[in-house]
Amino acid sequence: MAPDFPWLTAIIALPALSTLLIPLLPDKEGKTVRWYALIVGLVDFALMCFAFWQHFDPQATEFQLAESYRWLPSLGIQWSVAVDGISAPLVLLAGFVTTLAMFSAWQVNQRPRLFYALMLLLYSAQIGVFVAKDLFLFFLMWEIELIPVYLLVCIWGGKRRRYAAMKFLLYTAAASIFILVAALALSLNLPGGPNFDLGAIAQQDYPLGLQMWLYAGLLVSFGVKLAIFPLHTWLPDAHGEASSPVSMLLAGVLLKMGGYGLMRFNMELLPDAHVRFAPLLVILGVVNIVYGAFSSFGQTNMKRRLAYSSVSHMGFVLIGIASFTDLGINGAMLQMLSHGLIASVLFFLAGVTYDRTKTMVLAEVGGLGQVMPKVFAMFTVGALASLALPGMSGFVGELSVFVGLASSDTYSATFRTITVFLAAVGVILTPIYLLSMLREMFYTREMDLSCDLGQPTNVAIAGNAPVCFGNDCVLPSNAIYEDARPREIFIATCFTVLIIGVGLYPKLLMQMYDAKTQTLNTSVRQAQAIAKQPSEPIAALQAPELTMPH
């Protein structure tokens, strides 16, 4: 194909247009549609890999693979898509996780056609968010993504699925209003009339007052998606009720939209305001790390514990973005990509465990390691990656953020010391709540064979003998659990190979965005150098005047 082939448009359109053929597929049980959706996902992911391999230059800092088509010219709206160093890796992450999430959904037998149609539509919307070069198009893709997620949680979720789905919708839809307001304010203040193009907006110097107000609004919008405290409460509910394939997308891709938005809009378009808000981001990041870690201890539901773990890990993204160092911003990007892989495999394995035990309550399982050794081994690797074991991707991302903040000359030594210390407390807590979860799930508890055998529970046993925990005993028939199937081993292996590969050779991903993050940091450092007195941000919060086109 010619180099000017519309790669990104094709990548966005393929999954969405493929849903039109799903009603024509022959079977209603889902055997055909699941393979159809998987093939579409694989083809789309292959298109991404080929397009970036052939036409993406990681050393270039400008937009690449750019396409622009007139859509609503009178309003300055175009179908404009492109990628650069911070969007291309996230596009690949979305394609990788979504394809494997569809492969993991083999057990879905309730309305499978609708399920896979929504998964493919979500696939397109996710890619659209990361490649949109037009602010209005970004907002449109951001809103489209809400619809399939809401339906996927509401229809295929747990007992409280409607509550969780509605909470997610209300939080995200309400917060996204600020994205629309920011898009209108930035485009209407450009010379020559409304223009939603990111390149044109990035070249414009906006008044500090306008930047401050828009930054605050966008921080709320992206903070909801990134699960920043106290805007995070939708996440544990959504994870607790969503099916595991949907949880993989919530943790692996949707959370990253918030981090991407902060880097793309708050940092790149509003650098003067970013300088003023950066200390707040660091504080919020520390709160996320510590609060998420402590909250995980009190969770009896496996997926809710993993959800609060995600809240904790997203704190490193905030700190890295506000570090004013190349290493810290690189660490924030790597943390997003690494967490996307690690959280996805953990939620997948939580689903594998639920398929056998039919419970997410940690107190109702135990001793699974002896009857499901393969699941135990895979879960252990995922947990070790999540607690940032050296040699795995999580370690490199978190270490880069720590060193980046500690070496930043923007903050005082006292501020840096306190921040690093508190963040380290959260890091220390991570292995405690993760390893305790593994102990509850997989290690056989102390057996008492003298107890009454009349009370069977949902706890697994080892071998053929009854197992008693206090007054609760398990009969042998209750403990027949199938170990991991080849499909499940393949999915977990795909994630594990990347997690270890990036941990051992982080340049594999960092080379894609290093040049771009350096450019971002240079721009905010320049804004920092010309920043006015510290008292001015407060005065700058006077309501700005918007220039309306004649």
Swiss-Prot record:
**Molecular functions (GO terms):** NADH dehydrogenase (ubiquinone) activity; ubiquinone binding
Q: Gene name?
A: ndhD3
**Compartments, record wording:** Cellular thylakoid membrane
EC number of the protein: 7.1.1.-
| Protein name from the UniProt record | NAD(P)H-quinone oxidoreductase chain 4 3
The UniProt entry's sequence similarity note says: Belongs to the complex I subunit 4 family.
Top-level taxon of origin: Bacteria
**Could you tell me what reaction this enzyme catalyses?**
a plastoquinone + NADH + (n+1) H(+)(in) = a plastoquinol + NAD(+) + n H(+)(out); a plastoquinone + NADPH + (n+1) H(+)(in) = a plastoquinol + NADP(+) + n H(+)(out)
Q: Which UniProt keywords apply?
A: Membrane, NAD, NADP, Plastoquinone, Quinone, Thylakoid, Translocase, Transmembrane, Transmembrane helix
Q: Name one GO cellular component term.
A: plasma membrane-derived thylakoid membrane
Please report the record's description of how this protein sits within the membrane: Multi-pass membrane protein
Q: What does this protein do?
A: NDH-1 shuttles electrons from NAD(P)H, via FMN and iron-sulfur (Fe-S) centers, to quinones in the respiratory chain. The immediate electron acceptor for the enzyme in this species is believed to be plastoquinone. Couples the redox reaction to proton translocation (for every two electrons transferred, four hydrogen ions are translocated across the cytoplasmic membrane), and thus conserves the redox energy in a proton gradient.
GO biological process: what's one of them?
electron transport coupled proton transport
Q: Which parts pass through the membrane?
A: 5-25, 36-56, 86-106, 114-134, 135-155, 168-188, 212-232, 243-263, 277-297, 311-331, 332-352, 375-395, 418-438, 489-509
| Xref: NCBIfam families | NDH_I_M, PRK12561.1
Principal location class: membrane
